[in-house]
């Protein structure tokens, strides 16, 4: 099934078609790199892209559940045509899972590139709260993807082991003998189980179990294809798991984080000192401005009212003309009372 999956994926790549989610993330990264967004808007765009990745993770989990259910259903089928139809369904699920995994890988790499661009912005350098938040979120997504990888790995092991048991039971049904481990591994790895059973039928004349041969062949084809696709899917997951471990080690580097934290604390203290200096200067110049404004207001009031004009001997201005003083008549001469008598 892996061949079918890888073939369909290669076809989609050759056609030049790209997943819409990946395109959206690349477009948002272009906006960030173009500097069209500030810090808050960058985080908004970042978390929108994270939501896209979460949706793909949910889709991957759904496909894994479908594959597990189909494998359980295959245990109840004993008809070649039914097994063939189920094989097609499982092929489609594994193909979709591989496409989703590759899209997830591309989206996570796009988020890493966006984080690199964000580190070049002011206040968002390596070790900053914004950088650590973004890096932790991306690594969390990778760990979720690693969990999905483990689920698919368990499904692959289950399918392989159950197929081995099925081939052993079929050989026992036809030949009357259960093959040893080496023979069973050789039959499964080389695909000679059908030839082996056909020889047994020819020797024993059991033409009535041709349906069993067809069923085994369909199961063999299905398991081989699925195993190939799951191996390819597993390799994609392993590539991302290496990045998770590497970046997780960087996050867990306590000594380095403490040094970066000390550097940020010192930088913050220096900025507080500068802010205090600017605050004092601002207050001083504010007082000067208020004093100057008061002086200007006083001068305006003085020159508007002109209090010196209300005082008689005041300063400047044209001199007033003196009012002429009327001379009073002299008193009448005194009369000698004696003469009158």
Swiss-Prot record:
This protein's record includes keyword Glycoprotein: no
Entry-annotated residues carrying N-acetylmethionine: 1
Cytoplasmic side: 1-284
GO MF annotation terms: SNAP receptor activity
Any Pfam family: SNARE
SMART domains, A to Z: SynN, t_SNARE
Lineage top rank: taxon: Eukaryota
Family matches, as CDD domains: SNARE_syntaxin1-like, SynN
Biological process terms in GO annotation: defense response to fungus; intracellular protein transport; protein targeting to membrane; vesicle-mediated transport
UniProt keyword Transport present: yes
Coiled coil: 64-185
Binding partners and assembly: Part of the t-SNARE complex.
The family this protein is said to belong to: Belongs to the syntaxin family.
Protein name: Syntaxin-122
């Amino acid at each position: 099934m892996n061949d079918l999956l890888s073939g369909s994926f290669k076809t989609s790549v050759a056609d030049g078609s790209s997943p819409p989610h990946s395109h959206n993330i690349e477009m948002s990264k272009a906006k960030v790199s173009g500097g069209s967004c500030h810090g808050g808007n960058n985080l908004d765009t970042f978390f929108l892209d994270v939501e896209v990745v979460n949706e793909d993770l949910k889709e991957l989990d759904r496909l894994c559940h479908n594959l597990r259910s189909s494998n359980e259903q295959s245990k109840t089928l004993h008809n070649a045509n039914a097994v063939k139809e189920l094989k097609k369904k499982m092929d489609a699920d594994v193909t979709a899972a591989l496409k989703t995994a590759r899209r997830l890988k591309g989206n996570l790499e796009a988020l890493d590139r966006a984080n690199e661009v964000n580190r070049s912005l002011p206040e968002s350098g390596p070790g900053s709260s914004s950088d650590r938040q973004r890096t932790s979120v991306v690594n969390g997504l990778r760990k979720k993807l690693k969990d999905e990888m483990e689920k698919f790995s368990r499904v692959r092991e289950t399918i392989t082991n159950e197929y081995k048991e099925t081939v052993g039971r079929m050989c026992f049904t036809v030949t009357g003998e259960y093959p040893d481990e080496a023979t069973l591994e050789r039959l499964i790895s080389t695909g000679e189980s059908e030839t082996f059973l056909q020889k047994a039928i020819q020797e024993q004349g059991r033409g009535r179990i041709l349906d069993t041969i067809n069923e085994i062949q369909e199961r063999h084809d299905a398991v081989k294809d699925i195993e190939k696709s799951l191996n390819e899917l597993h390799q994609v997951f392993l590539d991302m798991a290496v990045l998770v471990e590497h970046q997780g080690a960087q996050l867990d580097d306590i000594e380095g984080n403490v040094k970066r934290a000390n550097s940020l604390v010192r930088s913050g203290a220096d900025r507080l000192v500068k802010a205090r200096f600017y605050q004092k200067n601002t207050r001083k110049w504010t007082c000067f401005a208020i004093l100057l404004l008061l002086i200007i207001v006083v001068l305006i009031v003085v020159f508007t009212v002109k209090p010196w004009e209300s005082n008689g001997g005041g300063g400047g201005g044209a001199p007033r003309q003196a009012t002429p003083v009327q001379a009073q008549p002299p008193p009448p001469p005194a009369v000698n009372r004696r003469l009158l008598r």
